Amino acid sequence: MLKATRKQADPYKSKLKVSASHSGPHPLPVEVTAAEEEQAATFGQTSPQKLSLKGSQLGGSILIGNYNYLTQLEVCENEMEVLDLSSLAQLETLKCSRNKLMELIINGTNLQTLVADHNYLHNISTTNTHPVPLKLQRIDISHNNFSELPNWVGACASLTAINASHNRLNNVAVLLRNYRITELVSLDLAYNDLKQLDQFPEGFSSIRSLQLQSNELPSLPDNFFAVTHARLETLNVSCNKLSTLPRYEQNNHAALVNLSLAGNHLNDSIFEPLHNAAKLRVLHLAYNRIGVLPAACVRNWPELEILVLSGNMLQQLPEEVATLGQLRVLRCCNNLLLCTPQLAKLAMLKVLDLSHNHLDRVNLLALVPSRNLKYLDLSGNLQLQVDEQQFKVCQSQSQRHWSLVDVSGNNRAALPTTKIRQVSAQRNQNKTSGPWTMGFAETPGSGDCRKLSVYQLRAANYGGSDEALYGMFEALEGRGRAAQEMSHLVPDLMKQEQMVKDSAVRDYMKFTLLAAQQQCGSVRSAALFHLTRTRAPSKVRPLKSKRYVLRMASTGGLDAYLIRRTSQLRLTKPDVIQKDQIHSMPDPHVLELILSNDDEYLVVGNAQLWSVMDIDRAAREIRKEENSLLAAKRLVDIAQSFAAAESLSVIVVRFRHLGTDVDHLIRELKQSVRKKPQPVSLPLSSGSVCKRTCCDRSNACRHRAIEQEPLAGRSSPSGQSDRDLLAKDKDDEFVLAHARVLQEEQQLEMLDETESVSESVLSEEQFKCWEYMLEQNTQLLFDKELNTISKSFTKQRTVPNAIMAATVLPERNDFTSNLMRTVTNKFISTSTPQLPQPITTSVPLGSYHQVKQAPPGHFGSALSFQQAHSYGYNLFDAKPRPKFHGGTVKRSAGPNSAYFGSLQRLMPYNFEYDFAVTQERERNILDEEEHDDDDFNEHESRMRKYWGVATTEL
């Protein structure tokens, strides 16, 4: 083989001269120097037959001509945009992968192999003399932009393999209607947009492997099994929209060995065409709507080795499952199982997953095989009871140490032997109150189930409830112990690095990984993620200090993505190993990112996961599960149905409640104002069954259909505008509820970035103004109105004895003071006020009058408004204000005081008072507050700047 390459040391002595034109109409051809001609002549050749230009930095338009004897050409990993090979009539093998090709012209006279994956091609042109490459045997055009296959593909009679995955194909009519292929063995159309398949021609009977996963197919052709049953061994139709399989009554000698139907809408009717698939070894039926596994089918699958039934509605497994002597992997998580067969008879069973079912009691002696079982998962069965004596007997029979893994995050070291309802209730409470929840899944390769090659670090409470540390370490071949030791050593190392004050904030992550590799040895890949709270003040909203930050350090091929509401962000860099890094520790990639309400999930996976699944598919699957553990398990099951054969490891962190204290207050306000939807019973259609329990899966459950009443009209902050502006249909109100909440939270975050908001329709603008007032001026408005009340008491000539007696009442806590404790205390406590009630029924005119009625419903906590009694707080300038002792008290009226009347009907006070009397008192003391008019005008202009509305004083 004559390999012509370009030396970087001296470009003038290179054997190959290439001229590439980006803009010229006639690109210059590739030429060979005289030295190369002499070398070719010594071998008895007039021109080289094999030419490799891999990684030669070729760009632009390339025209290669005058090479009549060139048979093999490799131009991979360049930056070519146009490649014209129309003059190479003797070319047999062409490899042009990983370029930027948008146009490719080939000569199909003798072409046998065409590999053009990872480009931007949407068509491949041929010459007029040979429009169809009749000798073509293999074509790979995956990872391109094809919307349909080239029109000459179906006429290539010698084709044996077609790979057109990861394109934009919406149909393959060109291939099926003009089908002249006689020996096609493999067809890969996965990861496209196929919505329909026409009837298969008779020539399709030769196919053995058909990949159709991750498409939009609602059904397979009616003659599918009639044509393919004799030779088809591998069929993958996972993640489509199949509801049934085509029937074929004469399918007595089906050749199917590997069948993947995960992630569809299949029901119990699919087992009829699979009844006689006696050669079946691998069956993936996860995440469908299967309720019963027929015992007759199980008896006809004696060679079954892998059976995956996760995410269905199975209530029991047939006893015939215990007769599958070759079964190695059985996954039935996320079902409705109440009992299990005696699986201890399965001597070859190595992986058993029965998690997230309804199991209450398990007989380990009848369930667990004594010797070969490597992984047993019984987590998620909330009422599960295990006999501790049975556990000890099984452990002694296996003569091995059993490692217990608690997936709940409580780090329990023992099996649950009794029902613990309190722990379950506390666990559910933690799920709703924490800033994030974590789920993980890991499994060995399907070929070798002996050990894991990827180890995880899961420290959910690393430094407290709002701090976590996660990591993933992939071992080198035969060095799994180094990765395992690193996962145990990293937490202590990072605490030591955090104590170093001289280094940068995020450098402790980098040095932690380097120190771990120095002590434990090198690993193939490593990734470390630290979630913690930052208290850096915001520039626009000073109170918005409760922020969370994600810090990451990674090396190798582990990939991590941050899934947001409308996009996905890759956190790790592509794995590029340089020559100087082969025998040295690579420099970790460090990243620091402030989390926001738009961030939904953090997904970390090893290279095997991302080799069969992209982030778009992963995000789509994760959003189908509310439980983070089930989301991680779903990714692993889907990846295995996509033919992932090696070890898989996934960590899924679901973010929620990442907002600030003010955001939490606003969220609680919205929940108290809006009427909560009440569940209603709807008539169930035939076959509609609750797919999962309500705690695990709520998105597809028909029993959770709810209806919400329309909001009571509040079209303006003052509540005095027309209510018809907010009138909506009940169904529309519930359907758009989630989108409306997301939009409101996004508007809260926009206040950190800008000080201007675009104009909108009247009702939306008024709602924004009301929301802004609640967020920015809640504290200010409480102080202002309570000060007004206190001043009115101090100006009265006669004070009832009952009220004066209230001054000696004890304080409720250190941060709250009684309203009438002292006359000089002009600024009242900001906690929820509790005014004393007068004993006498006669109340003087102008004094405080309290109406006895049931207090309105509370929202949130009084701690949301508490501050020290010595200081007030101004939300506009973020500065504490000192307490005045005597003299004229400065009025604490904000720019939104005009809307305080409307707020009174929403704020859940513990007292009520007459608004007319309050307004009369306010007019009587205006002479003391004239010097605050300038401040009020300034704030009023600011309100106009933000929202374009005018304010009026009450």
Curated annotation (Swiss-Prot):
Region spans: Disordered: 1-28
EC number: 3.1.3.16
The keyword Manganese is assigned to this record: yes
Listed GO biological process terms: apoptotic process; intracellular signal transduction; protein dephosphorylation; regulation of apoptotic process
Cofactor: Mn(2+)
Single GO MF annotation: protein serine/threonine phosphatase activity
SUPFAM superfamilies (UniProt xref): L domain-like, PP2C-like
Enzyme class: hydrolase
Domain PPM-type phosphatase: 437-655
LRR repeats: 69-89, 90-104, 110-131, 135-156, 158-179, 183-202, 206-227, 231-252, 255-275, 279-300, 303-324, 326-347, 348-369, 372-393
Any matching Pfam family: LRR_8
SMART domains given in the database record: LRR_BAC, LRR_TYP
Organism superkingdom: Eukaryota
Reaction(s) catalysed (UniProt annotation): O-phospho-L-seryl-[protein] + H2O = L-seryl-[protein] + phosphate; O-phospho-L-threonyl-[protein] + H2O = L-threonyl-[protein] + phosphate
UniProt entry keywords in alphabetical sequence: Apoptosis, Hydrolase, Leucine-rich repeat, Manganese, Metal-binding, Protein phosphatase, Repeat
InterPro entries, A to Z: Leu-rich_rpt, Leu-rich_rpt_typical-subtyp, LRR_dom_sf, PPM-type-like_dom_sf, PPM-type_phosphatase-like_dom
Task performed by this protein: Protein phosphatase that specifically mediates dephosphorylation of 'Ser-586' of Akt1, a protein that regulates the balance between cell survival and apoptosis through a cascade that primarily alters the function of transcription factors that regulate pro- and antiapoptotic genes. Dephosphorylation of 'Ser-586' of Akt1 triggers apoptosis and suppression of tumor growth.
PANTHER family named in the record: IG(IMMUNOGLOBULIN) AND LRR(LEUCINE RICH REPEAT) DOMAINS, LEUCINE RICH REPEAT CONTAINING 53
Annotated protein name in UniProt: Protein phosphatase PHLPP-like protein
UniProt source species: Drosophila melanogaster (Fruit fly)
Gene: Phlpp
